[in-house]
Every structure is written in C-alpha cells, then in structure tokens.
Amino acid sequence: MASLNLEIITPERVVLQAEAASVIAPGIQGYLGVLPEHAPLITPLQAGVVTCRRRERAEERVAVSGGFLEAGPDQVIILADTAERSEEIDVEWARQARERAERRLRERPPGLDVARAEAALRRAVARLKAAGAI
C-alpha cells in the first residue's frame, strides 16, 4: 500500500520525519488532506494542527504557527515558522497564553496590535488542540 514521507521542518530543527498514510494540514482556506499519489501542490499554512495518520499507530499531531506545505505523489514537506509535537507542549503555558490573548482582545488597551494578539490566540489554541486539551 502506498504511503507518504512526511517532514515537518522549522528553522531550528526537523520536528517530525515519518511515513504517513495521510496528512491533514491547516491551509489558509481551511484544512486540507493529502493522500499518496496527490497532485503536486504548494500552499501557505496558517496556525493550526498537522495530523499525521500512520498505519502502525493511530495518529501524531503537531502544532504549527504557519508556513508552507509542499506535496507530491509520495512526500509532504512542511516548512513551518514554529512547530511542536503534541508531547512537547506545555498545556498550562498554552492555556495561560490563550487567556492572555483573549483578555487583551477583550479589553483592547490603547496601542494594542490586534493582528498580533489574534495570531497569539490562534497559536495558543493550536497548541491546546494538538495536545488534546480542547
């Protein structure tokens, strides 16, 4: 049965190298799925959860903060700004980050960079989802 070679890479390290049956990633227009024999594709990613479905294990989740996905017939390469495997995520820290971002967006202090606060909220939510905390 066909499979995909998945690599998730940040500027600092290779976060995940795995053989996958399928990959689901957070495209800018919604989540997209990649199966073996996929047509060539390059697309930007937003903050969210990349799900690697494996044959020998159910799945592995990685929180990404954005980047690009390149897919081909037998491989998927994700170049992410940042990425954390589910087991690396500090859930309490991510909850606090989400609460801080929500509070800033709710209170709207003078000089608030709304886009930056919204991006922080999306990153925190992605971490919590990848860790299975929400």
From Swiss-Prot:
Q: Could you tell me the keywords of this UniProt record?
A: ATP synthesis, Cell membrane, CF(1), Hydrogen ion transport, Ion transport, Membrane, Transport
Task: Fetch the InterPro entries from UniProt.
Answer: ATP_F1_dsu/esu_C_sf (IPR036794), ATP_synth_F1_dsu/esu (IPR001469), ATP_synth_F1_dsu/esu_N (IPR020546), ATP_synth_F1_esu_C (IPR020547), ATPsynth_dsu/esu_N (IPR036771)
Q: Under the GO molecular function aspect, what terms does this record hold?
A: ATP binding; proton-transporting ATP synthase activity, rotational mechanism
Q: Provide the protein's localization.
A: Cell membrane
Bilayer topology reads: Peripheral membrane protein
Task: Respond yes or no to whether keyword Thylakoid is given for this record.
Answer: no
Q: Name one GO cellular component term.
A: proton-transporting ATP synthase complex
Q: Which HAMAP family match?
A: ATP_synth_epsil_bac
- What job does the chain carry out? Produces ATP from ADP in the presence of a proton gradient across the membrane.
Family per UniProt?
Belongs to the ATPase epsilon chain family.
Whom does it interact with, and what assembly results?
F-type ATPases have 2 components, CF(1) - the catalytic core - and CF(0) - the membrane proton channel. CF(1) has five subunits: alpha(3), beta(3), gamma(1), delta(1), epsilon(1). CF(0) has three main subunits: a, b and c. In this bacterium the a and b subunits are transcribed but do not seem to be translated, thus the ATP synthase consists of the alpha, beta, gamma, delta, epsilon and c subunits.
What PANTHER family does UniProt report for this protein, alphabetically? ATP SYNTHASE DELTA/EPSILON CHAIN, ATP SYNTHASE EPSILON CHAIN, CHLOROPLASTIC
Tell me what this protein is called.
Answer: ATP synthase epsilon chain
